[in-house]
């Protein structure tokens, strides 16, 4: 049935990626197209450039070849060497923190761009800022954290004059509250690893993006996030991250 559906799409002149729900943001040089694939895996397109973020979940056979790949963390719902290979154009750079580079040694081909928390680079023509992502209090046991400071990166990328922030796995840390001029923020909200919807909403109120998109929320109620931001002036867009 899936093969038949893809065939119909092709006969209609559509890419199989059209099977994913899409969302657009007006930007200089054309709209930015956001395609949620699954959980924290997302495809971003602008002006002919394709960016794949955390290609580790969902049916990646429908994703477009990426000119740039971003990886936030070592956990399996963010990192998959096989997933990177599926969505990456030949020679496309992969941006990752040092901890991820250690994990993928010998499994992901160059070029690899390692970024540390707080660092800024332009890679494949895209300005990128690495934002700390970590837990403040939550962990598997007393005195332990699920995500330690410095291990993973959130990312702010700039496309067509718009700043998109992918938070990755994090609680509401001071570095997030200090973000400025964010147009679109992808915010996680699942327990026990990140934060509940109410806490994510309070975090968003601190740095005031124009649009907030919940992701990485399996099992959580996005309605709570929407309700908490009602009247804040922040637009909430709930996309289909868990297709059936």
Show which residues each predicted segment covers.
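N-terminal secretory signal peptides that target proteins for export/translocation
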Residues: 1-2
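Bacterial N-terminal signal peptides
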Residues: 6-19
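Core dinuclear metal-dependent hydrolase active-site scaffold
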Residues: 22-64, 114-180, 239-244
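Active-site metal-binding motif and surrounding structural segment of the metallo-beta-lactamase
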Residues: 52, 56-103, 180-186
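Active-site environment of divalent metal-dependent phosphoester hydrolases
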Residues: 59-61, 76-79, 101-104, 119-122, ...
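Redox-cofactor binding/interface segments in oxidoreductases and associated redox assembly factors
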Residues: 70-71, 129, 187, 214
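Binuclear metal-ion centers of metallo-dependent hydrolases, dominated by the metallo-beta-lactamase
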Residues: 108-124, 201, 205-244
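Proline-aspartate-enriched helix->loop->beta-strand connector
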Residues: 182-187, 191-214
